[in-house]
Amino acid sequence: MIKEKLGHRLDGWIHTFFPFLFWRPINPDWLTLAGTLIAGSAGLAFAEGAHGTAGCLLLTGGFFDLVDGAVARHFGISTRFGAFLDSSLDRVVDVAAMLGLVTFFARANEPSGVLLCSLILVATVLTSYTKARAELIVARMPGGLLERGERIGLLAVGSILDILWPILWILAIGTVVTVVQRILYAYREMGRLDREQRSERVEEAN
């Protein structure tokens, strides 16, 4: 939702506050990898109960995730593989964070936490999959209630401020709602395309 509203305006803010990133070309794929290593390590921090540290790692990795695209666009070095790599490694971070929390709650013998984080993990994977699968057929899938940026931001802030439980419930409900939104959108759009295709066949037959 936030990404849809702000769009590339984020690039301007990054240029303003971090001009040194644009002094000379940097391979954006390296920034993507660096961000993944940093944010992915949050999973280990979550597993060890260092939730504040995990939140800081997620925010730092998220910064790299914003910067890689801005750098690529600024120097005109965006590639299809870069976009693919960025999207794929985002999933790695998502899964690592939730697995870290599942491990933490399992060690603490809190089955409710394990179930809640498992639900978030499954819904997060479905959120990504429904969008990728639907966009093979329809032109564009709207983001929905909670996109990745909102999910990571909420999890990071909740971890740093030590309000993890309410944030996890927000993530669980919001992510499931997002999955349902995307499925309903795909249902409507694919139904429309099917109707148009049938109409064309009828016209051709006549």
Predicted regions located by residue number:
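A feature for the membrane-embedded catalytic helix bundles of lipid/isoprenoid biosynthetic enzymes
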Residues: 2-19, 88-206
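Residue-level detector of alpha-helical secondary structure
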Residues: 16, 20, 36-39
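Membrane-interface helix caps of multi-pass small-molecule transporters
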Residues: 20, 24, 70-74, 133
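Helix-loop interface residues and adjacent transmembrane-helix termini in multi-pass membrane transporters
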Residues: 23-25, 47-48, 77-78, 137, ...
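Membrane-embedded alpha-helical segments that form the functional core of polytopic membrane enzymes
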Residues: 32-81, 111-122, 164-174
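Membrane-interface alpha-helices at helix entry/exit sites of multi-pass transporters
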Residues: 82-87
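Structured catalytic core of nucleotide-sugar glycosyltransferases
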Residues: 23, 31, 40, 63-64, ...
